[in-house]
Design a protein with these regions (language model features):
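Metal-dependent phosphoesterase core characteristic of DEDDh/y 3'-5' exonuclease domains
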Residues: 25, 89-126, 203-207, 257-332, ...
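Well-ordered alpha-helical segments embedded in enzymatic catalytic cores
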Residues: 60-64, 131-138, 166-169, 235-239, ...
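Short active-site oxyanion
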Residues: 73-76, 246-251, 457-459
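Alpha-helix capping/helix-boundary segments
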Residues: 83-85, 258, 467
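Conserved "right-hand" nucleotidyltransferase catalytic core of DNA-directed polymerases
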Residues: 144-225, 281-282, 305, 316-317, ...
């Protein structure tokens, strides 16, 4: 309890850690909130596991937490644990819901808000403090009847031209405005040669802009997905190419290495090996530009890491404007797609206005204008150039690797140790099922039948880390010499190779060698060969493998 213990409480703070002074210092005192209205409860954590399961969280919430909240006549809950918040609010994500006060999934008379734990202020203050501030202001406003959800009324002017003439007129108006613009596209895929341009937006400030369809063709009368199909709008593409040629001011993107990369190919290149069009597009699109993803990286980078996505960087401004990330724009109604696209453009302005001054104040402007911008041009050119592949050789090498893979699988399957382990797994399944069943009994025949099902928990799977751990360390009895970041016994290829030095058993040595071969070949067959097989065919008869580089990540410039 806080304040007068005899006063009825309106708000309950839920926390895994209960420290009265830390809670007051973090959530109450900085915002001038009445302590008499608050109480706090600790949240149950399963002592047997590192992370409490969702099933346990739900059971505790339903049987213990909600009854107590009702008994205390609590109207608001400030939850400082992300997993409990998901259960209480009935949402899938936490960060996109910061600043929202949502009805409780178990009782609509209780409202729930999320704020990071006070402990996070110690190890990640730059991210935790703004989120706590946003959450507490929203909660206070809701208590006073002045609540406005994040993203409400951010659009002051929006136009969605839908004819060739109105699109042309608006592009002329944008040129006449003689000011910087933000630009964002929605496309059909992540690869430049299949992306097309579904829709595009241009915004001239944080609250005004336009958006229009390009290659997205609405399906007339559609009442369920798909709502559109992919086309090729030659006329609108020509207008866009001409617009970018005429544009004299900076255009601001969030992740220019995607948007401009797609636009260069779709508007200026005839095919995937059109180097003349590529260089022309680079000259047009990459002369005057800004990238708020790079700006955000330089303004917010810390040892604790940062999420550079537009949704995260602009969440306090636009809220949760898309419940799910768009994976297939044809499943989005055209009006919603355009509204979503427009808010992306407005949000890009917000992120620019928020982080650009910080980047300058942190003395990062020189590296941004120099190294980062010049590297970005190189990255986009590399992404559009690709690497030529001899597909006949790819097919040939795949067959060789498959032989090696099959050999490794056979050696593993033929090993008596593995056969015994697989048998023990079936026995364990039989024991577990019979303990669950009231009358019916299962036997080895049922276990064998279970093995035939596509998804089952009986089959021996060499790709399963828990099974490998059990086989190598529990069944065979090899020593644990390496651990994963999660403090689990390591079973990666390098560790398995080292384990050869810790046994003289010929059966174990043969098995370890088979695992080493299996791991190496499987990685190439599943990770590299499929990408090569899907390489794009160029007009010269060669296939081209294209990749993407991430500048502004933990490992910058990594393919």
């Amino acid at each position: 309890m806080f304040g007068d213990i005899n006063t009825s409480k309106t708000v309950c703070i839920l926390s895994v850690y209960l420290n009265r002074e830390e809670i007051k210092k973090t959530y109450l005192q900085p915002f001038g909130l009445d302590e008499d209205a608050f109480m706090a409860l600790s949240l149950y954590q399963d002592p047997k596991t590192k992370k409490t399961s969702k099933a346990v969280l739900k059971e505790y919430t339903e049987t213990e937490l909600i009854p107590v909240l009702k008994e205390q006549n609590i109207s608001y809950v400030l939850c400082t644990d992300a997993e409990y918040f998901k259960v209480l609010a009935g949402v899938m994500k936490v960060d996109t819901n910061v600043g929202y006060v949502l009805p409780c999934a178990y009782d609509p008379n209780i409202h729930v808000a999320y704020a990071p734990s006070y402990k996070s202020v110690f190890y990640d203050p730059d991210k935790a403090k703004p989120k706590i501030e946003t959450a507490m202001h929203s909660l206070a406003n809701h208590l006073e009847g002045k609540y406005k959800a994040p993203g409400d009324n951010i659009v002051k002017f929006a136009e969605y031209p839908n004819t060739l003439q109105t699109i042309s007129d608006w592009l002329d108006k944008l040129i006449a405005m003689d000011c910087p613009l933000t630009c964002d596209i929605e496309a059909f895929s992540l690869k430049h040669h299949t992306a097309g341009i579904g829709s595009i937006t241009f915004c001239w400030n944080e609250s005004e802009g336009i958006a229009f369809l390009v290659d997205y063709i609405p399906i007339e009368g559609a009442t369920e997905a798909p709502f559109g199909t992919k086309g090729y709008n030659k006329e609108v593409r020509a207008l866009l190419a001409n617009f970018f040629r005429r544009m004299q001011h900076k255009i601001i993107y969030h992740n220019i290495a995607y948007d401009a990369y797609v636009l260069i190919y779709q508007l200026f290149m005839k095919n995937i090996i059109d180097t003349t069009g590529l260089l022309d597009g680079i000259k047009i699109m990459l002369t005057k530009w800004e990238c708020t993803k790079l700006i955000s990286y330089l303004a917010t980078n810390s040892c604790a890491g940062n999420d550079l996505s537009l949704k995260t960087q602009a969440q306090e401004f636009a809220g949760n404007w898309a419940q799910d990330d768009i994976k297939d724009i044809c499943k989005i109604e055209p009006s919603k797609l355009l509204a979503y696209n427009l808010i992306d453009g407005l949000s890009t302005w917000f992120v620019h206005n928020k982080h650009y001054p910080t980047m300058v104040a942190e003395q990062q402007l020189d590296i941004y204008e120099g190294l980062f911008k010049s590297t970005t041009v190189d990255i986009i050119q590399m992404q559009l150039t690709g690497m030529p592949l001899n597909m006949a050789r790819v097919i040939e090498v795949k067959a060789i690797l498959q032989q090696d893979f099959d050999s490794a699988v056979k050696r593993i399957s033929d090993c008596v140790l593995v056969q015994e382990y697989a048998y023990q797994r079936k026995l364990a399944w039989i024991t577990k099922r019979n303990a669950e069943l009231k009358k019916k009994r299962v036997d080895m025949a049922d276990a064998d039948a279970e093995l035939l099902k596509p998804k089952n928990t009986v089959a021996w799977n060499p790709n399963s880390y828990p099974q490998l751990q059990e086989l190598l360390y529990d069944v065979i009895g090899l020593p644990v010499i390496e651990y994963t970041d999660n403090k689990q016994p390591a079973v990666d290829g390098d560790t398995i190779a080292k384990l050869k030095n810790h046994t003289t058993d010929s059966r174990v040595l043969v098995l370890l060698e088979a695992f080493i071969d299996y791991t190496a070949v499987n990685k190439i067959l599943t990770g590299f060969i499929p990408a090569m097989e899907n390489a794009a065919l160029g007009p010269d008869g060669w296939h081209y493998l294209f990749g993407n580089f991430n500048l502004g990540g933990t490992v910058s410039g990594r393919l």
